[in-house]
Amino acid sequence: MNKVVVITGGTSGIGLDLKNLFEKNGDTVLTISTRALDNPNHFSCSVSDEKSVKQVVDEIGQKYGHIDILINNAGFGMSGICELLPTEQIKNLMDVNYMGTIYTIQSAIKFMGKGSKIVNISSAMALFPVPFRGIYASAKSAVLTLSFELKMELQPLGIEVTAICPGDVKTNFTKNRIKEFETNNRYGERLQKATEKSDSREDKRMSSISCATKIFKIICHKKLKPFYIIGAKYRLLYFATRFTPKSMLLNITNKLYGGTK
């Protein structure tokens, strides 16, 4: 049966691949992003703009009568020293990555019924934070926790909710990540070392289509688990960390990403 699927950030990377997979499946896909496209099924707005999001989702819901699947994929990354990051950039990241998720969910729920699904794209970094990526990790951690709460809150309505935590994926996400390289004598070269460590994994990252295909198959399940980790390495790591003291885990991660000055 044809489904109405709404994807934020659906014009690039994982979002675009998901759009293509659902369209190939015969579903009607509506995308929301800041890009301006000549496509009647695309809506150009920032998910951080609450009023615009409500207008777009209302238009979709009124036209089709219902929304079967909402995928909150819009977001961007940031790295830098927390002490030195511009607060406006931090607020902008939280507005897009976290508040944008809330805005779309609040607007869409009234068009969603029993059997519909909300899929929030979080990140493996919500589970395994690394130095100098704390703002992004905390935003994705908030998305993960929100998903857990909504799974309970919406269960009586028959709405399935899950969070997807992908590991390293080869998209323009890393290239487009806001990178603040300002440092001082308190941090020395640690930021540079951590950035180099992260960027050095580029060739080892999972392809976007591979990640999207795994997510697509998950969404096709009738019942959804509270969250899914994409990437065997990260699933194994998650299992191992359940039996590892948090202080030990943080110390190991810190050493891998620059450690001390």
Feature names for model-found ranges:
Residues T11-S12:
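Conserved glycine-rich cofactor-binding loop
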Residues S44-Q55, T87:
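The beta1-alpha1 cofactor-binding region of Rossmann-like NAD(H)/NADP(H)-dependent oxidoreductases
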Residues I81-C82, P86-K91:
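Substrate-binding pocket helix/loop in short-chain dehydrogenase/reductase
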Residues I105, A139-A142:
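Active-site helix of classical SDR
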Residues I105-Q106, F148:
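A short, exposed helix-loop element centered on a Lys and neighboring polar residues
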Residues P156-K225:
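SDR active-site lid
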